[in-house]
Amino acid sequence: MSDRVIIFDTTLRDGEQALPASLTVREKLQIALALERLGVDVMEVGFPVSSPGDFESVQTIARQIKNSRVCALSRALQKDIDAAAEALKVADQFRIHTFLATSTIHVESKLKKSFEDVLEMGINAVKYARRFTDDVEFSCEDAGRTPIDNLCRMVEAAINAGARTINIPDTVGYTIPSEFGGIIHNLFNRVPNIDKAVISVHCHDDLGLSVANSISAVQMGARQVECTINGIGERAGNTSLEEVAMILRTRQDLIGVHTNIKHQEIHRTSQLVSQLCNMPVQPNKAIVGANAFSHSSGIHQDGVLKAKNTYEIITPESVGLNQNTLNLTSRSGRHVIKHRLALLGYPEGSYDLDQIYTSFLQLADKKGQVFDYDLEALLFFSQIQEEPEHFKLNYLSVQSGGSIMATASVRMKVGDEEVTEAATGNGPVDAVYQCINRITGYEINISKYDLKSKGIGKDALGQVDIVAEFKGRKFHGMGLATDIVESSAQALVHVINNIYRALQVAEHKERFAQKTVMETL
């Protein structure tokens, strides 16, 4: 049996289902490239048959990723498998992942079929998927609650049909480690062709046991773990990639397996996913939380100063958390900025140095000192704003306080024109939003507003994340500035530009549809 555990990341498929607003294709690609740098073996990036947008994102990612295997999900239906194969065919290497429920409650209540019918459906789905690729994965949905005799029959049949990976999900997070490990142990003892496939596990965290169940399964012979960055996912989430990777690395003495994960990329990837998905990492989250390497107890501090391993079983550096607090100022040159970014894991060529340096100088003039977390924030925001903006904030002024009604004046570039608007509101942010909405003419409802501090003290940057609803769709926007009102305005302008692009796409599709109709007449 192999001593390597395959890491199958499903952040962009299962993880995205938990998000307050869908990611754009560009944002998904940004995460996919980060996952590739992290060293994931397989990345499941979407469910192509579910929507044209999902199909497009899977196809875009499949075309760009070279060092990881790209996977798409499909039900055990030919139309689903066709869509997955079509989206993936541009990839250097790809996998089709098809699934079917096997538990009694799912078979009888959801599928309304006999288990024999389900068994035949599973066999047919795997055989059909094998027409497109040798790399087919089959999942027994709700395996954790499937009678073991039925589960063994399904696994054996799927392997005989051509599945090279068999996934055993604890779909509702119901099992405990000894129980789930026992299921894997049973499969290895009772399925005669088990050596012809890799056994995978996909555990949910409804009882807080997803990571523990996954590790128990690995100890019993599973050699693929399906997981997400920061453990994001439906309901209580999925198995946390960073926790599994660091457990297998830290306790290799006990478990005896390894992964291909580049551990120094963990923190950077976690932060990117958190920011793009608008899902803050809880401070006490293992491995990547803000407090994961903090020591407040005097006894602990004394011990760590004498020998770090008294209270630290892993180092911050091992997950890419650079603790160097070297401050940068407006007197720092381009070479220094390039050097700092390289130390943070951003090689030259992965960003526009001139653009970053200009933003850095503007921030340094405001703050005096700029820290590593400021640089990463500037880099992140420069990357998501590379596309030309139809709407651009040029100027804003706000008056408020005491008995004065909040009043704002905003000047924006709209296409090639410049438009100015003034408005009052229930506070300075609302007044600015009233101005922006008047300028754009969009009727927007802000359903979520979140303010986070990026840094320490009075000069910290304020990051504003909002979710806005427009014509039944949700759009996500972010802004970053030392002034909260300014970062709030930036976030709404980000939303406005996303809406504008969506409307442009819809208009293009409508014109294309009309042209197609005319050509058929």
UniProtKB/Swiss-Prot annotation:
It is found in: Cytoplasm. PROSITE patterns: AIPM_HOMOCIT_SYNTH_1, AIPM_HOMOCIT_SYNTH_2, PYR_CT. Keywords: Amino-acid biosynthesis, Branched-chain amino acid biosynthesis, Cytoplasm, Leucine biosynthesis, Manganese, Metal-binding, Transferase. Mn(2+) binds at D14, H202, H204, N238. InterPro entries: 2-IPM_HCS-like (IPR050073), 2-isopropylmalate_synth_dimer (IPR013709), AIPM/Hcit_synth_CS (IPR002034), Aldolase_TIM (IPR013785), LeuA/HCS_post-cat (IPR054691), LeuA_allosteric_dom_sf (IPR036230), LeuA_bact_synth (IPR005671), PYR_CT (IPR000891). GO terms for cellular component: cytosol. It catalyses: 3-methyl-2-oxobutanoate + acetyl-CoA + H2O = (2S)-2-isopropylmalate + CoA + H(+). Belongs to the alpha-IPM synthase/homocitrate synthase family. LeuA type 1 subfamily. This is 2-isopropylmalate synthase. It comes from Tolumonas auensis (strain DSM 9187 / NBRC 110442 / TA 4). The gene is leuA.
